[in-house]
């Protein structure tokens, strides 16, 4: 069973880059602040350009550094996409449950993500701002159906009251770890037999100070 805990004293076994995408004002920066620092600011301003935060945690006795990247959703910042997506092994695709338009744009964001990132990147669809449930404009079932159709994980969250924020990030990070661990095992087995592993192709992941190539596999799930 996986264990999650902050640990800054051990060596880093893996560094996983995860990107936050979605329209502006859906709460991407607030989700990042809640997960990385357990903070929430009512006065949050729109993100300009790109920033990232890190959090170190433990999964199955391995020390993982999650590098979470955040960029503004406005069209004028789209120029950063190539560098932004490069090397990402996970993505949090965020919409605001009170703004139907932000959900309607999810398909476009997903297309852009899949056009720039590894085709097997692990993706979590997030319906944020459940604390504003009385203003809901996107039925949960609509998002579940989209996630199932596109082979995505799905959760609804609230950065304000922290509901499901931790589980959503940990689900993605655990899935990435599971895939990487499985591929490393296959690589070791084929290495011993003199074979080549076709699995070890795709997104670069830093492993214990060295770069090894791996790719994630999306998985369907709902919450």
Swiss-Prot record:
User: Which Pfam family, any one, appears in the UniProt record?
Assistant: Ras
| Any one Gene Ontology BP term | protein transport
Q: Name one GO molecular function term.
A: GTP binding
Task: Please give the chief subcellular localization of this protein.
Answer: membrane
Q: Which domain of life is it from?
A: Eukaryota
Where does the protein end up?
Cell membrane
Cellular compartments per GO CC: plasma membrane; plastid
Q: Which key words are in the record?
A: Cell membrane, GTP-binding, Lipoprotein, Membrane, Nucleotide-binding, Prenylation, Protein transport, Transport
List the ranges annotated as motif Effector region: 44-52
InterPro entries in alphabetical order: P-loop_NTPase (IPR027417), Rab_GTPases_membrane_traffic (IPR050209), Small_GTP-bd (IPR005225), Small_GTPase (IPR001806)
Residues with lipidation of kind S-geranylgeranyl cysteine:
219-220
User: What this chain does, per the record?
Assistant: Intracellular vesicle trafficking and protein transport.
Family the entry assigns: Belongs to the small GTPase superfamily. Rab family.
Q: What is this protein called?
A: Ras-related protein RABA4c
User: Which source organism?
Assistant: Arabidopsis thaliana (Mouse-ear cress)
Origin organism lineage:
Eukaryota, Viridiplantae, Streptophyta, Embryophyta, Tracheophyta
């Amino acid at each position: 069973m996986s264990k999650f805990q902050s640990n800054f004293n051990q060596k880093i076994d893996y560094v996983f880059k995860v990107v936050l995408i979605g329209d502006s004002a859906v709460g991407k920066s607030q989700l990042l602040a809640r997960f990385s620092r357990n903070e929430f600011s009512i006065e949050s301003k729109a993100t300009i350009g790109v920033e990232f935060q890190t959090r170190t945690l433990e999964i199955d006795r391995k020390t993982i550094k999650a590098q979470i990247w955040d960029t503004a959703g406005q069209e004028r910042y789209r120029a950063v996409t190539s560098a932004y997506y490069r090397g990402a092994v996970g993505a949090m695709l965020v919409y605001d449950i009170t703004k139907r338009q932000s959900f309607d744009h999810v398909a476009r964001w997903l297309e852009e993500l899949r056009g720039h990132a590894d085709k097997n990147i692990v993706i979590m669809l997030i319906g944020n701002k459940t604390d504003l449930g009385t203003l809901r404009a996107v039925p949960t079932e609509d998002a579940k159906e989209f996630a199932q159709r596109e082979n995505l994980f799905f959760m609804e969250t609230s950065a304000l009251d922290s509901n499901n924020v931790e589980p959503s990030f940990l689900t993605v990070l655990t899935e990435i770890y599971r895939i990487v661990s499985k591929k490393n095992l296959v690589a070791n087995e084929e290495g011993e037999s003199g074979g080549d592993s076709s699995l070890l192709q795709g997104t670069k992941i830093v492993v214990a100070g060295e770069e090894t190539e791996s790719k994630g596999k999306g998985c369907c799930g709902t919450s």
